[in-house]
Amino acid sequence: MGTALVQHGGCCLLCLSLLLLGCWAELGSGLEFPGAEGQWTRFPKWNACCESEMSFQLKTRSARGLVLYFDDEGFCDFLELILTRGGRLQLSFSIFCAEPATLLADTPVNDGAWHSVRIRRQFRNTTLYIDRAEAKWVEVKSKRRDMTVFSGLFVGGLPPELRAAALKLTLASVREREPFKGWIRDVRVNSSQALPVDGSEVKLDEEPPNSGGGSPCEAGDEGDGGVCLNGGVCSVVDDQAVCDCSRTGFRGKDCSQEDNNVEGLAHLMMGDQGKSKEDNNVEGLAHLMMGDQGKEEYIATFKGSEYFCYDLSQNPIQSSSDEITLSFKTLQRNGLMLHTGKSADYVNLALKNGAVSLVINLGSGAFEALVEPVNGKFNDNAWHDVKVTRNLRQHSGIGHAMVNKLHCSVTISVDGILTTTGYTQEDYTMLGSDDFFYVGGSPSTADLPGSPVSNNFMGCLKEVVYKNNDVRLELSRLAKQGDPKMKIHGVVAFKCENVATLDPITFETPESFISLPKWNAKKTGSISFDFRTTEPNGLILFSHGKPRHQKDAKHPQMIKVDFFAIEMLDGHLYLLLDMGSGTIKIKALQKKVNDGEWYHVDFQRDGRSGTISVNTLRTPYTAPGESEILDLDDELYLGGLPENKAGLVFPTEVWTALLNYGYVGCIRDLFIDGQSKDIRQMAEIQSTAGVKPSCSRETAKPCLSNPCKNNGMCRDGWNRYVCDCSGTGYLGRSCEREATVLSYDGSMFMKIQLPVVMHTEAEDVSLRFRSQRAYGILMATTSRDSADTLRLELDAGRVKLTVNLDCIRINCNSSKGPETLFAGYNLNDNEWHTVRVVRRGKSLKLTVDDQQAMTGQMAGDHTRLEFHNIETGIITERRYLSSVPSNFIGHLQSLTFNGMAYIDLCKNGDIDYCELNARFGFRNIIADPVTFKTKSSYVALATLQAYTSMHLFFQFKTTSLDGLILYNSGDGNDFIVVELVKGYLHYVFDLGNGANLIKGSSNKPLNDNQWHNVMISRDTSNLHTVKIDTKITTQITAGARNLDLKSDLYIGGVAKETYKSLPKLVHAKEGFQGCLASVDLNGRLPDLISDALFCNGQIERGCEGPSTTCQEDSCSNQGVCLQQWDGFSCDCSMTSFSGPLCNDPGTTYIFSKGGGQITHKWPPNDRPSTRADRLAIGFSTVQKEAVLVRVDSSSGLGDYLELHIHQGKIGVKFNVGTDDIAIEESNAIINDGKYHVVRFTRSGGNATLQVDSWPVIERYPAGNNDNERLAIARQRIPYRLGRVVDEWLLDKGRQLTIFNSQATIIIGGKEQGQPFQGQLSGLYYNGLKVLNMAAENDANIAIVGNVRLVGEVPSSMTTESTATAMQSEMSTSIMETTTTLATSTARRGKPPTKEPISQTTDDILVASAECPSDDEDIDPCEPSSGGLANPTRVGGREPYPGSAEVIRESSSTTGMVVGIVAAAALCILILLYAMYKYRNRDEGSYHVDESRNYISNSAQSNGAVVKEKQPSSAKSANKNKKNKDKEYYV
């Protein structure tokens, strides 16, 4: 079989018991290291961290080898002492992963003499002393000075399993070191003698007799193979070389004589039983010859329940030297082969995990040895021979008065491989037994003293013989011959038959399991099995007893059960046991056991005490309380639990049962009370799904094929893949099935009412949610009888986990109170987020999405969570709640609690204890909508609590441009306002150091009769956030951090008289008209009607919206329908018609023969400059040549626009600073006397022209378009300098875009020499209806020649409709961002009914390259854009030409421009100054100190550059009044 390894365990190796310390010292024994592969010895850990030393004596002739080694098990720190470089000692060590420090001794020590070696550790320094002649030290350059030590102190070599596990060795090169060859003795740590713990291939021997230091086995000429030839194995017995030739085919002292008749050991008889033990001529096994080749062999077959029992009571054994021989053949890994003795006087020989185990106790403690083959196992269905000898020896002590001591050497041999394993205690040399000799098994193998296994042998045993100086017991022969003292239990065949193997099975899924009969183990019992898996969790065995009620004086009845379980959690194996007086939970092994290797588990119990062992490591336990009876009444479940668990009671301590963790992996060799269980056959009988009758491990990793769909996370399991679908929104083995979504509107819930009350100590919870609210309950467990809860909720945009385990129903001291954890930020972003909670006892872990997990440890007296319900959306069980969390508005998905996907189980009807009114499917949530029917309607609520932070959320829907949505005032100047201004949302506030305005970001006005979501928040660091639908605006304010509000909170508006006293940054002059819903005030969900302190106006529940809506034909003649809350209106601007539906004739003038003219002149201080123009007019004529309308700029500028008829076709010419640009409809003849409508728009150099319903004619200048040229120009020079910039661009040859300083509109063409003759109607130009103004005798209109008004001026209703349309047109037309002049502030006071047209004109906005800068800016603008606006793109859409953009100009403009053109240098200076002054201005929000005169400074806050000399700020108010009429280019 090759070289064998001998491992030693228990508390005794080479006299290893602490009781033997004197034995080893008195004997003067050392450790002999033969230098064999696999040789090692381990001493207890030397804590060499700081100041410590160890010493030993060494004797060798070897030039290299590993002397000692220890480390921190694979991290940083280690210390190594080796022989190298001609037999010199070299020491290396490292601390904290520093560069290893090394020193090399000067003196060789491989001279065959004893040398004293001492190692002294002193923080970063280590000193090596050799004898008294040499001392060298070395220091490591480490940031840390203390060395960390985890491993034992290995001397002479390293265990093979440690060499194979490279990650467990800090110094990888130590694996390649040769083993030490020589002797080591007197190992001391800090002057105290150290005893070895275990080892292999190392012999305990006295000082070698030959002064040369060589072993007797090394004799012979140089170059020989030693004393033993032909592969014989040499060992030292009584200082003599003994050769074992049994496996060589040779015999003789040195295995030199060929002998083909040599056979195995079991059938050989002793040639001379009386031969003296003192005979120095004792040889090895090779001298044993067959006495009779035809002798009958005595063989028996054992199948797990059979055994022999020889009664020793008549003739007790009392021996000091004895021998046991037998042969075995089996496929089973574990089983008892032979046992005799009881209590502390016994011999046990067994097969343990495929190795031969020997345990001997003569009264001084157990001595154990384990023999394993190098390759494979002994359970290979081949014959193997075992021989055990125990000899009494006399040994000489050194340095003590008693020089002669007796001790016993124990030798075990398997297949002729002889190994001296050590000595028993000298004070106990006699084996005494008056009990029984058990062969092949026993009635209760687990209860035998020292038994390492719990099951009987399965296989064949041959020639089992025990002999000592006085007796020879051929046990196999006696059994077959029916000796009266030999009892045979079971049916034994006295021949070798094939024994059916216990085939392994594989549990392929967590749901698979096998039911075993009830385990009757009231007083004693044993279970053993092998398992193999790579999965971290799983319930392997479980059974419980009858439920019983445990009652104390304080609390209601509690259900308790006896139970037994073995489970895996996080790769560790646990034993759980409760016999009615308390639960024990034992970790069977400190290392993880899910590495895919086979592990043998052996559980044995006797009353309250017992052991659980994994492989060779045994852990004892003692159950608490007085009970010794384990009363199991239910079936014993293997691998998992049935799906229907209604009849089962799960103790809280069995976490895998409550977490639904079934075992996935292999099980084999299950023995219960020593009886084998054919689990493969049981699985077939029960037709269990997911159980396979074999065990193999697939080499390919399943996750390499990416089996998890929809971004599921894959983990390799045991021959399977495991998908984590928790963050995907899908379910199923491969995340292939979309998970159900539940929608909650704040009044909806889902409640799982569990059939029985649950008690758990471990939970796995995961869910996905999506919400725009910063507050709301996501999930909670609730109890009807206690305050216990595990609750997840949104709290200020974070996920808050609350776990409360109270003492109401637990006999404990007062509970500590709830534990809380927070994770995530800004989770109310209407995006899906995944939450995971893992609790294991007192350990908590909370994870949101892929962020770092938050962990915590619970305090308190217990870990049991009680609950009857799992609730979502609303908590209905509120009896023990001190405060009720806010209801949830949003969506939930994939709620999984301990493996149960409750939302989908509820939807599919798989559970019948589900109650809900939440709606399945993803739905838009509009919660509690309320309609404010009029602009004077509002409600008052309790004061908004937003002192340190704030989270507001609401939804609105309106068609109104303006309106106050929310207002709350406070102490001093503190206030908060949310309002709509020109369709855009403003958030205005004052924390005490001045008012601030933040404009919400949106691509278009929000008064589009669609629902919009608004979130406004302020955190403790004064970060303000405004989110409208998906667009976010943020700003940090300095100074005061608290919002101290005092008065009522007004929603929808305020009292009429209050508008006058609102802060200046607030535009609102009326309330909000439309719908509000889902109002969330810092976590409070008010009912706007029932919770109102008082209501005003018409407020109704629900939201029906406008009674009439815009249709395709709502407005005639291409009028534009504008949706209003109480109906709609028509914009008739570009139609030439009037009336509510654009079907009434517009104001019409007839120009008779001889010609006439209507002229409109702008006041000198009010002349507009525009980048875009819109012109529409209706006419009828038969003329081929005529001018209809002409617009001219101020004298000297030359800009113009002319609408004319040429050769019966309509066309337009214009010039805005360079060449004339013309556009014409060449396909339409319009001088046919019929009524035609022409529409013209211009944007820069681009223009469109349409006649009636003919296709629109578009004109774009050749080359780069104006917009591109404008963008290039504005990259370098902004348009703030107006005409100055135009002149600069003209010099550079670039196309201009501004129609400067418009002075007159001439209608009729008389001055141009081409008078128009015919009818003109409904003229519209950039917001002016000039013919209407002429009919109303406007002061700026002059009429000359043959011009006659037809009919009457449109009625007042028509005028109002027109005004409404004009106002709406100005607010909805697509234009550049603009800024209002300071002059509009003065004009705002004009009565609106007196001059409606003028008012509309005054509302025309000044074109600007930047966002607004004062509190009156009411135009759409991207806040915080930080750059120049694109003149042709607003809100991401390409506009059509024609938005009116107006710049006012004074009468002195012309002269000033001429002067500036002449002084180019002065222009450059002004340009640089303007760019420097305004380039870094914040455009997204505005702060105003209201203590100052804002109106007087508003012009300069526009960022305007004045074409005239600016008046000093120190001038009088009269000068300020005058300066308001200056022209500004913005």
UniProtKB/Swiss-Prot annotation:
Membrane topology label: Single-pass type I membrane protein
Signal peptide region: 1-30
Binding of Ca(2+) 2, residues: D788, L805, R864
PROSITE patterns, alphabetized: ASX_HYDROXYL, EGF_3, LAM_G_DOMAIN
Highest taxon listed in the record's lineage: Eukaryota
Expressed in which tissues: Brain (neuronal synapse).
S-S bridge residues: C228-C243, C245-C255, C460-C496, C666-C695, C703-C714, C708-C723, C725-C735, C906-C914, C1075-C1103, C1110-C1121, C1115-C1130, C1132-C1142
Sugar-modified residues: N125, N190, N813, N1246, S1408
Tagged with keyword Lyase: no
Molecular function terms from GO: acetylcholine receptor binding; calcium channel regulator activity; calcium ion binding; cell adhesion molecule binding; neuroligin family protein binding; protein-containing complex binding; type 1 fibroblast growth factor receptor binding
Pfam families (UniProt xref): EGF, Laminin_G_2
Domain Laminin G-like: from-to ranges: 31-217, 299-496, 503-695, 741-914, 928-1103, 1149-1347
Family from the record: Belongs to the neurexin family.
Function: Cell surface protein involved in cell-cell-interactions, exocytosis of secretory granules and regulation of signal transmission. Function is isoform-specific. Alpha-type isoforms have a long N-terminus with six laminin G-like domains and play an important role in synaptic signal transmission. Alpha-type isoforms play a role in the regulation of calcium channel activity and Ca(2+)-triggered neurotransmitter release at synapses and at neuromuscular junctions. They play an important role in Ca(2+)-triggered exocytosis of secretory granules in pituitary gland.
Subunit structure: Interacts (via laminin G-like domain 2 and/or laminin G-like domain 6) with NLGN1 forming a heterotetramer, where one NLGN1 dimer interacts with one NRXN1 dimer. Also interacts (via laminin G-like domain 2 and/or laminin G-like domain 6) with NLGN2, NLGN3 and NLGN4L; interactions with NLGN1, NLGN2, NLGN3 and NLGN4L are calcium-dependent. Interacts (via cytoplasmic C-terminal region) with CASK (via the PDZ, SH3 and guanylate kinase-like domains). Interacts (via cytoplasmic C-terminus) with CASKIN1 and APBA1. Interacts (via laminin G-like domain 2) with NXPH1 and NXPH3.
Identification of the protein by name: Neurexin-1
